[in-house]
């Protein structure tokens, strides 16, 4: 690491130009190739997936995206001559637009079912030639503009569907800008130097920007969800600025000790840079743990996020030292430079609030530890009510046309019309057709069913489908129960004695199947992530207790963050106020991605905190001193890093995307809890209570473990010399604090 840092400092212009060339080249390639994101929730082997394949084979004309144009009259009927004339003309214009395959009108012979019972709401179905992921935003906008052109006093027109949601996609990068600005303010307050505060941001932006373009190219090679670039940017900005902050802090410490700019930058990368690489590796390993689930949808998310972390780490240990050499001593504030020139290098002694807090934790570990546990328990309680499901356009903000179309359909035709179940089967002969006719009658009397469409056969007569509309909303537990009832009770009885094998599909059933698969694989996934993280910490700190405590802290942080997400998004505490739409279930893939990201981020703080304690333990063998000094020296930088990360994560609530907002709030809550409760309260309290047992490792395991070190051996001796003055002064302070008052 020292050699790499020295090369980057000595050839700083080359290092900067190489990064700019990489950023420009990848961005240009992404602009030429375009994006190819896909939200494919299909899971091999599920019933909904099988139903989708049968439907595609028997009814290929249904393969395009299907959207709705909904209109509502404030008075009178949608069958009024003027309304019918206006909307018929509008639908004809939509049918002539590029990309539109067919338009079904409620005014056609078979359109009676598309008019509400009160006659005030009607809808038309617009089928595109392509799937939603292949539809150009301009095509969707043309449909919206044409439909909206029919609005007048008393006639309201709204549009819903996957393609229509493309027109609601927020433009610009407000969330990223807000996050970066807040981070810059925090960095300036921490450093007192404008130049030093801008370097972590510049480093993170180059690394994340290169990764953002790289993810667009990655979408051409594998399935990558459309939210993956934003998720990568969210995580990348957070960890990228943090990693650079740690290195700049160490560099500034070297300058204050009198080192040259080159020596300070080289030492910072050789020491803290190693911790950054180790921390980044833990994040990547946690993210790649998603590959064990073998779900195509999540593989792309894992690789995309991992790519972002890798590039931010690389920028932190190569681009950053080059930039540090450019600004020279201006990494220090004017006051620090003046003090250094007047008084020379001074030993750093932990003082102020950090030192007092560390001493308080040492004196009251049981009380403060119990308080921290109580906070974690309260925040984690809502997690017990976690319900997985997929949000739909009913969760969109009330100002969007997709949400208003959803509500109009639910009010006019019942809540289930927004999430029907599709039944598909192969048909072998007359007996099967007779059984399907009987099934139609049976379904109409089944609990939870609002209506059933007549059976429709393909042109060859070998595949049949019918649509079941529930009497409950798509996100309701009653709808999920209806799907289970059909699969386990109603359909097996109808199939008895026939060759039928009716499959229950549709978007709602597909989401339920996806959630079931995720829940089934979650224990294995969590075990793999925890196991790999513990193994890394075991190798780094050669202790059994440190990895086990880290695993427990990570589980606590995850549970508490899920509790916050459940309260905001599932229970709806403030979701409408924040512009996040109405309450609904939690996305089924959120726990998997959150466990990966949070375990990685939590390991970061664990590494930076415990590595300093471990260094002190190796030098003194005094656990109480190691914990006290480690907490006092790292708490300020960890808290500054946490404030930056929280600011970046919360800024993504402004993205307008419900999924990204979930990630932002969950990550912000977890980092806040981790930094201000777990790492500065519970972890040191437990380490004080456990004493030397923190560092226990069985002899047989000690002999077999390979040796890796976050701090390089050559820096260990230098650290001992460097801290001699600090040790002496701290001991004097301790002695003075313990001595009784005298009479002088």
Predicted regions: what they are:
Residues 23, 38, 74-76:
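Short active-site-proximal "capping" loops at secondary-structure junctions
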Residues 45-66, 74-161, 385-576, 607, ...:
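Structured non-transmembrane domains adjacent to transmembrane bundles in polytopic membrane proteins
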Residues 32-34, 66-73:
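Short, conserved active-site loops that position catalytic residues or coordinate cofactors/metal ions
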Residues 1-35, 100, 117-121, 131-388, ...:
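Membrane-embedded transmembrane helical bundles of large multi-pass transporters/channels
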């Amino acid at each position: 690491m020292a050699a790499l840092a020295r090369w980057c400092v000595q050839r700083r212009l080359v290092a900067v130009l190489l990064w700019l060339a990489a950023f420009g080249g990848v961005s240009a390639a992404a602009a030429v190739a375009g994006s190819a994101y896909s939200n494919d929730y299909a899971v091999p082997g599920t019933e909904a997936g099988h139903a989708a394949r049968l439907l595609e084979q028997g009814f290929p004309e249904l393969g395009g995206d299907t959207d709705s144009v909904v209109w509502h009259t404030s008075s009178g009927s949608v069958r009024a001559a003027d309304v019918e004339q206006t909307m018929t003309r509008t639908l004809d214009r939509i049918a002539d637009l590029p990309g539109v395959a067919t338009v079904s009108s409620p005014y056609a012979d078979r359109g009676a079912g598309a008019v509400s019972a009160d006659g005030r709401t009607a809808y038309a179905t617009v089928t595109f030639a392509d799937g939603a992921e292949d539809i150009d935003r301009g095509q969707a906008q043309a449909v919206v503009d044409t439909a909206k052109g029919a609005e007048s006093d008393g006639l309201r027109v709204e549009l819903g569907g996957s393609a229509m949601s493309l027109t609601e996609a927020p433009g610009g990068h407000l969330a990223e800008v807000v996050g970066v600005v807040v981070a810059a303010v925090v960095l300036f307050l921490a450093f007192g130097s404008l130049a030093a505060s801008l370097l972590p941001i510049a480093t993170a932006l180059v690394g994340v920007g290169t990764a953002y373009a790289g993810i667009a190219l990655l979408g051409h090679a594998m399935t990558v969800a459309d939210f993956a670039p934003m998720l990568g940017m969210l995580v990348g900005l957070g960890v990228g600025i943090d990693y650079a902050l740690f290195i700049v802090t160490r560099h500034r410490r070297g300058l204050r000790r009198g080192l040259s700019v080159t020596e300070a930058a080289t030492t910072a990368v050789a020491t803290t840079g190693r911790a950054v690489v180790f921390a980044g590796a833990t994040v990547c390993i946690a993210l790649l743990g998603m590959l064990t689930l073998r779900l195509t949808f999540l593989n792309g998310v894992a690789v995309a996020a991992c790519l972002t972390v890798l590039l931010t780490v690389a920028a932190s240990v190569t681009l950053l030292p080059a930039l540090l050499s450019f600004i020279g001593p201006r990494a220090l504030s004017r006051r620090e430079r003046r003090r250094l020139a007047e008084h020379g290098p001074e030993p750093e002694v932990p003082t102020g609030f950090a030192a007092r807090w560390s001493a308080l934790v040492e004196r009251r570990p049981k009380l403060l530890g119990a308080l921290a546990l109580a906070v974690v328990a309260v925040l984690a309680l809502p997690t017990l009510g976690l319900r997985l499901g997929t949000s739909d356009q009913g969760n969109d903000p009330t100002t969007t046309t997709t949400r208003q179309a959803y509500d109009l359909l639910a009010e006019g035709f019942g809540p289930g019309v927004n999430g029907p179940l599709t039944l598909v089967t192969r048909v072998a002969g007359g007996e099967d057709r007779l059984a399907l006719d009987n099934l139609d009658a049976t379904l109409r009397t089944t609990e939870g069913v609002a209506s059933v469409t007549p059976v429709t056969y393909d042109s060859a007569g070998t595949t049949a489908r019918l649509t079941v509309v529930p009497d409950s909303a798509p996100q309701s537990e009653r709808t999920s129960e209806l799907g289970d009832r059909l699969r386990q009770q109603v359909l097996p009885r109808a199939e008895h004695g026939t060759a039928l094998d009716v499959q229950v599909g549709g978007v709602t059933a597909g989401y339920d199947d996806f959630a079931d698969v995720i829940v089934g694989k979650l224990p294995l996934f969590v075990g793999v992530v925890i196991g790999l993280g513990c193994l890394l910490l075991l190798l780094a700190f050669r202790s059994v207790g440190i990895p086990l405590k880290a695993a427990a802290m990570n589980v606590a942080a995850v549970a508490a963050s899920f509790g916050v997400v459940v309260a905001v998004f599932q229970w709806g505490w403030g979701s409408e106020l924040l512009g996040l739409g109405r309450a609904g279930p939690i996305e089924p893939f959120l726990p998997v991605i959150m466990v990966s990201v949070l375990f990685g981020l939590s390991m970061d703080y664990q590494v930076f905190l415990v590595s300093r304690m471990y260094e002190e333990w190796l030098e003194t063998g005094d656990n109480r001193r190691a914990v006290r000094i480690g907490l006092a020296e790292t708490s300020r930088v960890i808290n500054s890093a946490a404030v930056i990360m929280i600011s970046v994560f919360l800024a993504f609530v402004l993205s307008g995307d419900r999924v990204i907002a979930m990630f932002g709030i969950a990550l912000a809550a977890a980092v806040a809890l981790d930094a201000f409760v777990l790492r500065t309260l519970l972890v040191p309290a437990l380490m004080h209570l456990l004493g030397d047992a923190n560092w226990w490792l069985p002899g047989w395991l000690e002999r077999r473990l390979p040796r890796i070190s976050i701090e390089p051996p050559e820096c260990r001796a230098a650290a001992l010399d460097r801290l001699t003055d600090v040790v002496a002064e701290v001991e004097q302070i301790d002695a003075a604090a313990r001595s009784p008052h005298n009479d002088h």
